[in-house]
Amino acid sequence: MSEAKTYDIATMLDELGMTTAALRWKEILSGPELGDYTAQQMLREVITPQYVEMKDNKYRTNLRLSKLVDKTARAENCKTSSGRRYNDDVVQQIFTFDFVSKGLNAGIYGKTGAGKTYLLSAVCDEACHQNYRSLFLDYTDLMDELLVLSQKDDLEKYTKKLKYYSRIKLLFLDDFAISRYSEEGIKVLYHLIKSRTDLRNPTLFTSQYAPAEWGKYLGDEPDCYGKLDGIRRRLATGYTVAIEKL
């Protein structure tokens, strides 16, 4: 292959926006190992740096859009040790992300300080690596926002925002059921959870309270029993992680 033709490839890669691949191609051409590659090895050598860069850029974008607060949380730290006990088999299953295609949820339970938020953050971080559209929110902040919008005369903004949260592929809610709401708040939560379930978009959450206790902590309006039961049945369908601080 002539020098003109080989550098023409670099130009084409540049024009395709594959600058990193073009640079690697030029490095190979000017290096002593040029004749050592098979065609497949050459292609892999040129494309891999571009692919890695693309994946890293996607991860950084996903992480920024996720609004994740603790960006230091990592999956490898979420296993039974001298400080905490997990049901490790379930945690490992969650990190495979098989639950996404099945539309299953994941609840992380434990007392204050058990490490629930850390695990939820680690799953969110890995979801960003896996290129899932993710959003990490405080449960109370989410509910307050939707409740305020639902009480305004212009319901278009409320409907639009509800659809937005419903369509996020993976919604991460920290401290679920930490605040009690009126009948209107329970109605808002019911619509959100039902919509996400219908769309088969998983919701992952932390909570201090078991599903059987949610009725007591989510709201105490007697007319809300049906909606509370609907929330519990839908949201508790999936994986359960219990964290015990030792």
Please name every model-derived segment.
Residues 72-97:
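N-terminal pre-Walker A segment at the start of P-loop NTPase domains
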Residues 132-133, 167-171, 199-205:
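Loop/turn-to-beta-strand initiation segments
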Residues 124-137:
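Post-Walker A helix-loop "phosphate-sensing" segment adjacent to the P-loop in P-loop NTPases
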Residues 102-119:
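Walker A/P-loop nucleotide-binding motif
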Residues 1-16, 21-22:
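Charged, compositionally biased N-terminal leader segments and the immediate start
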Residues 18-70:
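Interdomain "pre-motor" coupling segment immediately N-terminal to P-loop NTPase/helicase cores
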Residues 84-91, 134-166:
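Short glycine-rich substrate-engagement loop in P-loop NTPases that contacts/grips substrate
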